[in-house]
């Protein structure tokens, strides 16, 4: 269906003569897979429990002896992941090929549209965004080297959503650095507000044009975001309204952040007052 389509023409942008990176899916090495699971097993804080997702992915790691040391748990993880990795090695290879074929049809048009939307070009020296494919419970991203990881068995719609979501973060933070160079690098990650805000804005950005014309998925952030309320209104609804305004992207980013900062700090103040 997509072979004869040119998304750049469909959404009204030009993709010629522009330096754009390419997402290249690659098979995760066994050691890389082991390292991700070692991290994920002990990650039990933040907006979601990565540990719980890890147990679902590797049920053999559930109910380990509580007397085991971290090094002993690492050894169990190495054995479990090695066994499963070798069992699914051929599928990891075939899924890597499938992911590359599917995303290639969207790569240039999406990255061009994202650059146009955020009013910032991709870094000139960024030729490739590496996406490693393995047996993992979540899709970690690595801002400093423009890469992310993904598991096998992801359907077409979800694959496109993950690619769009993770790479949005890469260019989003390039724009954030341009607007707010004073923000420390550590605040780009959990649990800081700048990070939380970056995860919230994927909904109002990707669910609107031009991206909603390009993709058929419905972008959704963490469930906890949709439970936040500001008086009688949903915070996410108000954030969507901000991003629907006919104002510059810089104004949207700043107004949205100031709003989220006010609401979340107000919520903290109210909890303190009740103590």
Feature names for model-found ranges:
Residues 1-101:
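N-terminal low-structure segments adjacent to metalloprotease catalytic domains
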Residues 19-20, 26, 182-231:
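Post-HExxH zinc-binding segment in Zn-dependent metallohydrolases
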Residues 83-144, 208-215:
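Auxiliary, metal-adjacent structural segments of Zn-dependent hydrolase domains
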Residues 106, 160, 194, 198:
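Hydrophobic (often cysteine-bearing) scaffold residues that line and stabilize catalytic clefts
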Residues 146-148, 174-183:
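Flexible internal linker/loop segments at domain or repeat junctions
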Residues 148-163:
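Short pre-active-site segment immediately N-terminal to the catalytic Zn-binding motif
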Residues 161-177:
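Active-site recognition of the HExxH zinc-binding catalytic motif
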Residues 222-275:
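Pan-zinc metallopeptidase signature
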């Amino acid at each position: 269906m997509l072979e004869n389509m040119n998304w750049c023409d469909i959404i009204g942008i030009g993709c010629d003569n522009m330096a754009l990176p390419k997402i290249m899916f690659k098979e995760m090495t066994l050691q890389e897979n082991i390292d991700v699971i070692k991290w994920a097993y002990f990650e039990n804080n933040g907006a979601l429990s990565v540990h719980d997702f890890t147990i679902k992915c590797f049920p053999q790691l559930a109910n380990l002896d509580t007397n085991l040391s971290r090094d002993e748990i690492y050894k169990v993880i190495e054995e479990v992941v090695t066994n499963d990795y070798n069992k699914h090695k051929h599928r990891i290879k075939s899924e890597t090929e499938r992911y590359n074929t599917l995303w290639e049809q969207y790569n240039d048009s999406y990255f061009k549209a994202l650059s146009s939307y955020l009013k910032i070009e991709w870094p000139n020296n960024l030729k490739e965004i590496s996406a490693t494919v393995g047996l993992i419970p979540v899709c970690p991203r690595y801002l400093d080297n423009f890469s992310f990881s993904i598991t096998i068995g992801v359907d077409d719609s979800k694959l496109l959503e993950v690619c769009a979501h993770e790479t949005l973060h890469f260019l989003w933070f390039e724009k954030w650095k341009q607007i707010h160079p004073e923000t420390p690098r550590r605040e780009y990650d959990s649990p800081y507000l700048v990070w939380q805000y970056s995860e919230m804005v994927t909904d109002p950005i990707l669910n609107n044009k031009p991206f909603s014309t390009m993709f058929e998925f419905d972008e959704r952030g963490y469930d906890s975001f949709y439970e936040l309320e500001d008086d009688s209104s949903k915070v996410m609804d108000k954030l969507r309204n901000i991003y629907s305004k006919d104002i510059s992207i810089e104004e949207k980013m700043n107004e949205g952040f100031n709003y989220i900062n006010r609401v979340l700090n107000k919520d903290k103040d109210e909890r303190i007052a009740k103590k």
